[in-house]
């Protein structure tokens, strides 16, 4: 029995290594295509460097996990250790790990508490937002401060700034761990899980979908330019 367990473990490690290598190859090939045809990409992509930051070492990642009493989702962990610690991506790009814990849109730039569980499992927004009379002004500061508090996004990383203070979140603690959410509180639209075909999506699914959409846009632009 002992030998069988060792062999199975070895096969799982080999399989996981092959999956990682294939994903890395696929992502880098797609990145290279986008880089070659950047002039045909969407506006947000044109404003970015089509490259990645240096990877984090295993020691750096373990230190981060130990400090915050979490383990990062496997696909994201692999990405920052094998492909890059931030760089080209949705919105204004992927934020590096050390910046993803800082809520940059708040004046005092507080850290997000990762050792607390992400508080939501379904889409959330405050009820007062739909009943508030926006023609008469804005809510009181205390109400807004409570609404945009980092307590609503505890247990998540702000991995990408979409624009206007809205961000993409990767949940790293709680029932939604590993899933991507959209934080639209800067536009008073609350917190919403990202879905694909009605299902929650992981970091790597979200990221590869972004690359595929950009490639589709480029191919369409290339086709239009040759037929014009």
Q: Residues of each region from the PLM?
A:
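A surface-exposed partner-binding patch
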Residues: 20-151, 155-158, 222-226
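Structured loops at beta-to-helix junctions and adjacent beta-edge loops in soluble globular domains
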Residues: 83, 97, 160-162, 171-173, ...
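Short, well-ordered loop/turn elements at secondary-structure boundaries
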Residues: 152-155, 162-166, 175-176
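Segments surrounding the PLD/"HKD" phosphodiesterase catalytic module and close analogs
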Residues: 167-201
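Long, compositionally biased interface segments
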Residues: 190-228
């Amino acid at each position: 029995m002992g030998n069988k367990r060792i062999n199975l473990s070895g096969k799982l490690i080999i399989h996981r290594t092959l999956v990682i290598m294939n994903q890395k190859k696929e992502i880098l090939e797609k990145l290279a295509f986008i880089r070659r045809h950047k002039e045909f990409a969407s506006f947000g992509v044109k404003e970015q460097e089509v490259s990645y930051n240096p990877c984090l070492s295993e020691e750096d990642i373990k230190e981060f996990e130990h400090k915050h009493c979490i383990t990062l989702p496997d696909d994201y962990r692999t990405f920052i250790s094998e492909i890059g610690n931030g760089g080209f991506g949705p919105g204004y790009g992927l934020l590096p790990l050390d910046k993803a814990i800082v809520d940059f849109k708040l004046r005092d730039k507080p850290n997000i508490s990762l050792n607390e569980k992400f508080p939501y499992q379904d889409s959330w927004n405050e009820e007062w937002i739909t009943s508030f009379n926006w023609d008469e002004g804005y809510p009181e500061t205390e109400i807004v401060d409570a609404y945009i508090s980092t307590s609503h996004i505890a247990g998540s990383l702000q991995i990408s700034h979409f624009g206007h203070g809205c961000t993409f979140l990767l949940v790293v603690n709680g029932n939604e761990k590993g899933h991507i959410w959209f934080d639209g509180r800067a536009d008073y639209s609350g917190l919403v899980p990202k879905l694909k075909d009605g299902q929650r999506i992981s970091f790597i699914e979200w990221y590869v979908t972004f690359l595929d959409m950009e490639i589709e846009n480029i191919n369409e632009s290339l086709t239009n330019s040759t037929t014009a």
